[in-house]
Curated annotation (Swiss-Prot):
The gene is pdxB. This is Erythronate-4-phosphate dehydrogenase. Gene3D superfamilies: 3.30.1370.170, NAD(P)-binding Rossmann-like Domain. PANTHER family: D-ISOMER SPECIFIC 2-HYDROXYACID DEHYDROGENASE CATALYTIC DOMAIN-CONTAINING PROTEIN-RELATED, D-ISOMER SPECIFIC 2-HYDROXYACID DEHYDROGENASE FAMILY PROTEIN (AFU_ORTHOLOGUE AFUA_1G13630). It comes from Psychrobacter cryohalolentis (strain ATCC BAA-1226 / DSM 17306 / VKM B-2378 / K5). Its main location: cytoplasm. Belongs to the D-isomer specific 2-hydroxyacid dehydrogenase family. PdxB subfamily. The active site is at 239, 267, 284 (proton donor). InterPro entries: D-iso_2-hydroxyacid_DH_PdxB, D-isomer_2_OHA_DH_cat_dom, D-isomer_DH_CS1, D-isomer_DH_NAD-bd, Erythronate-4-P_DHase, Erythronate-4-P_DHase_dimer, NAD(P)-bd_dom_sf, PdxB_dimer_sf. GO terms for cellular component: cytoplasm. Homodimer. Catalyzes the oxidation of erythronate-4-phosphate to 3-hydroxy-2-oxo-4-phosphonooxybutanoate.
Length: 386
């Protein structure tokens, strides 16, 4: 067998532990070479020069024909992220390149981020009242449905909208109802464009198959924002362009709405004008827990082992230190929320990077790269395993 060459985003957790000859079941005479590269530096020239067998990425790297046209060796692409809007899966299928993404890897991390944001800004929502808080969830995949579990556990009412799923106890409302009847609206959708339109051609780094009958680009715009009460808090931890940033700024100016953004339309650059209007802003780290990161690596490691026809020999739980952050403890002692996750610290770190009216892309990426990973809150009633 030939040696195995892997090009990997250097920000993927525990690369050395998961991607070595022993963990990949390779014989001792075969080498596994892992070339670490910043995600935004994985380009067509690198792929042509190195000719790797395996490519491991995150959402900052777009996978398409322009990246791989001069590469003849890649047989496996793994994305250690939930989303897939950065990957042209149709092109990979045409090339017979196996693709795996880490579906659900950070669903608890992101759901806990949203709960933290809500209760940091409105601590009164810890208390049960005669009129329960209504949480509107747009997108009920892995993350949205997990957020619904936490909301239910806190006694909150749930209004959910996902046109791609069957009606259920949580998929129970129209988009208009969610926007107009909720105290909180939280977005958990992929980024998609309209079918049969040239719109995506005008968007840099767009993915050719990233289209839908229910497009989400600018789902939240000047028109849909008018459906929301000024009291309604808006949270986006999905994809930045789901919200029209210009319309959002105008809306906040008019309504003083509380808005929480972990993702931004023009990420990694953020304007000071937008940032100054937000109640909480963080640098795309909602899913950045130790468990979420390791789970993402575990999932693509398991998929690569399947591709190589070897049995996985490493579990993320072998790498995890003891976790003392317990969900039931937090519910009993809401005053410990800041100890569990101080979201304002992440907010301040981002705002401190403002120079000349903006946060530079390099500073945004640095905050993500050097982020001190949080721990997930462990729970008995809400599953936190893979």
């Amino acid at each position: 067998m030939k040696n195995l060459t892997i090009v990997a985003d250097s920000n993927i957790a525990s690369l050395d532990e998961f991607f070595n000859p022993v963990a990949l079941g390779q014989n001792t005479e075969q080498q596994v070479q892992v070339i670490r590269v910043a995600g935004r530096d994985i380009n067509a020239q690198l792929m042509a020069d190195v000719q790797p067998d395996v490519l491991l990425i995150r959402s900052v790297t777009s996978i398409n024909e322009s990246l791989l046209s001069d590469n003849n060796s890649v047989k496996f692409v793994g994305s250690a992220t939930i989303g897939t809007d950065h990957v042209d899966q149709e092109y990979l299928a045409e090339r017979n390149i196996t693709f795996a993404n880490a579906a659900g890897c950070s669903k608890h991390s992101v759901a806990q981020y949203v709960v933290t944001a809500i209760l940091t800004l409105r601590p009164q929502y810890w208390q049960q009242s005669t009129k329960p808080l209504t949480v509107g969830i747009i997108g009920l995949g892995n993350i949205g449905s997990t957020l619904a579990q936490y909301a239910n556990d806190l006694g909150w009412k749930i209004l959910g909208y996902d046109p791609l799923l069957a009606t259920s106890d949580i998929n129970n409302a129209s988009l208009e109802q969610v926007l107009s009847q909720s105290d909180i609206v939280s977005l958990h959708v992929p980024l998609t464009d309209k079918k049969d339109t040239d719109a995506q051609d005008a968007v840099s780094n767009s993915i050719s198959n990233n289209v839908s009958d229910y497009p989400t680009r600018h789902l939240i715009n000047a028109e849909t924002l008018t459906l929301m009460s000024p009291h309604t808090m808006l949270i986006n931890s999905a994809r930045g362009p789901v919200i029209d940033a210009a319309a959002l700024e105008a809306d906040i100016d008019a309504t003083e709405r509380q808005v929480v953004l972990d993702v931004f339309e023009h990420e990694p650059q953020i304007s000071e004008s937008l940032l100054s209007k937000l109640a909480i802003a963080t640098p795309h780290i909602a899913g950045y827990t130790l468990e979420g990161k390791l789970r993402g690596t575990q999932i693509i490691y398991d998929a690569l082992c399947e591709k190589l026809a070897v049995l996985p020999v490493l579990s993320m739980h072998q790498l995890l230190p003891l976790n003392t952050y317990l969900w039931f403890e937090l519910k009993e002692h809401p005053d410990r929320l800041q100890k569990f996750y101080d979201i304002k610290k992440d907010d301040a770190a981002l705002r401190n990077k403002i120079t000349n009216g903006k946060v530079k892309g390099s500073d945004f990426d640095q905050l993500r790269r050097d982020y001190h990973l949080r721990r997930e809150w462990q729970a008995q009633t809400i599953s936190v395993t893979i």
